[in-house]
Amino acid sequence: MDAREIIKYIQESEKKTPVKVYIKGNLSEINWEQEGIKSFITGNTGVIFGEWKIVSKLMEANQKNIEDFVLENDRANSAIPLLDLKGIHARIEPGAIIREKVEIGNNAVIMMGASINIGAVIGEGTMIDMNVVVGGRGTIGKNCHIGAGAVIAGVIEPPSATPVIIEDDVVIGANAVVLEGIRVGKGSVVAAGAVVVQDVPPNVVVAGTPARVIKEIDEKTKSKTEIVKELRSLIEE
């Protein structure tokens, strides 16, 4: 998706505040068959799911029949749902936050705590390590490793801005930051903690703040940054 498509999608999407309510009381007296509410009631206890503006009105109108409740709510007026992970041919660990309209290639790995925003692209065989942030439209190629805590900056506004592009076979070290509009060339390595403020050519190592080329990729560097395919393979039944 380009930036204008994303902006239009967010603007036109229905904003939602979903809630989950554990409820106790004289529940048989309440009409749960209402649009926007799903109820699972057994006797005088149950769980209901729905949009807060609908659920709150129903609960307010039936206060006398409700003895107690506990409400769970994790968002307000949310414009973008999370990505439906079923059917994605990749390893996605618990706690990763991936929004809708993200593309994930086959055999990619998304680790715990990673956050991937709308419009991002994760290439085949790429590993997104723990607590990585991939901003809107961030584009990462095939067989990359993005180290723990790294930030791939996103660009949705201004719409004319170019997103970050990480080409194939790139290794980004832990806690490195790649700023908006930067391209990191194929086969390069960004050292841990580096802040990348200008394009990186292919097959070099950059380090520092701001990041500068310190050497070309050699065999020693390749062995230290080897991508292990076994970590990315999925055993099919």
UniProtKB/Swiss-Prot annotation:
Amino-acid biosynthesis keyword on record: yes
InterPro entries recorded: DapH, DapH_N, Hexapep, Hexapep_transf_CS, Trans_hexapeptide_repeat, Trimer_LpxA-like_sf
EC class of the enzyme, as a word: transferase
Any GO BP annotation: diaminopimelate biosynthetic process
Keywords for this protein: Acyltransferase, Amino-acid biosynthesis, Diaminopimelate biosynthesis, Lysine biosynthesis, Repeat, Transferase
Pathway annotation: Amino-acid biosynthesis; L-lysine biosynthesis via DAP pathway; LL-2,6-diaminopimelate from (S)-tetrahydrodipicolinate (acetylase route): step 1/3
Segment forming the signal sequence: none
Superkingdom of the organism of origin: Bacteria
Catalytic activity reported: (S)-2,3,4,5-tetrahydrodipicolinate + acetyl-CoA + H2O = L-2-acetamido-6-oxoheptanedioate + CoA
EC number, as in UniProt: 2.3.1.89
SUPFAM superfamilies: Trimeric LpxA-like enzymes
A Pfam family reported for this protein in Swiss-Prot or TrEMBL: Hexapep
GO molecular function, one term: tetrahydrodipicolinate N-acetyltransferase activity
Similarity section: Belongs to the transferase hexapeptide repeat family. DapH subfamily.
Biological role stated in the UniProt entry: Catalyzes the transfer of an acetyl group from acetyl-CoA to tetrahydrodipicolinate.
HAMAP family (UniProt xref): DapH (MF_01691)
Listed name of the protein: 2,3,4,5-tetrahydropyridine-2,6-dicarboxylate N-acetyltransferase
Species of the source: Alkaliphilus metalliredigens (strain QYMF)
